[in-house]
């Protein structure tokens, strides 16, 4: 006799996160209610409330899922020498993180005013600043420091700007990474010239 399939708690949590993020992106964080999220999921508000008490709880859980890979990247990078190869590997790994969390990063960029007021805003700001610090050499000429940090931020801007450009998403991702790698290599080249 077949047993009925009951979604595991983690599956429900993940579905709530996906639906909420889609609604936040469609109509904005402020304009989305828990009731709308529950309706889209075809569950009661009480069932949704069992998993998350507020919209911020949902968003914080999504951000926490993203924060761990970034913390792992920071921990790895802090144990490495600040060489061009390390910086390039940071960019490659960060590209993977961005790629797998593209919807969240788009949401953050499109809802900056709302995000700034939430815990996720501070978390994102802190981890991005830490990555930026790892990318630059404090004793380097200012132009080299700017190039190194711009390499990181060009990946954010590239994701946002290139999303409406025709083409294969993987090719766009590769092109964005190529530009970031070029910027950090140029920063290192300027260091060896000076």
Protein language model annotation of sequence segments:
Residues 105-106, 110, 117-194:
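Hydrophobic/aromatic-rich alpha-helical bundle segments in the mid-to-C-terminal region
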Residues 51-66, 70-72, 78:
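Basic/polar, acidic-poor N-terminal "presequence/leader" segments
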């Amino acid at each position: 006799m077949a047993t009925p399939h009951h979604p595991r708690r983690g599956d429900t949590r993940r579905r709530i996160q996906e639906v909420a993020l889609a609604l936040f992106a469609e109509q904005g964080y402020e304009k989305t209610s828990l009731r709308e999220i529950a309706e889209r999921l075809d569950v009661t508000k009480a069932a949704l409330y069992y998993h998350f008490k507020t919209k911020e709880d949902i968003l914080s859980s999504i951000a926490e899922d993203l924060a761990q890979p970034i913390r792992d990247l920071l921990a790895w990078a802090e144990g490495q020498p600040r060489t061009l190869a390390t910086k390039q590997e940071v960019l490659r790994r960060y590209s993977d993180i961005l790629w797998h969390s593209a919807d969240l990063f788009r949401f953050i960029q499109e809802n900056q005013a709302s995000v700034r007021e939430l815990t996720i805003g501070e978390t994102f700001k802190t981890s991005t600043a830490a990555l930026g610090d790892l990318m630059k050499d404090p004793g380097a000429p200012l132009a080299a420091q700017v190039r190194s940090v711009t390499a990181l931020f060009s990946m954010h801007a590239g994701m946002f700007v290139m999303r409406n450009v025709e083409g294969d998403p993987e090719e766009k991702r590769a092109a964005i990474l190529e530009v970031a790698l070029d910027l950090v290599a140029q920063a290192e080249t300027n260091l060896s010239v000076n």
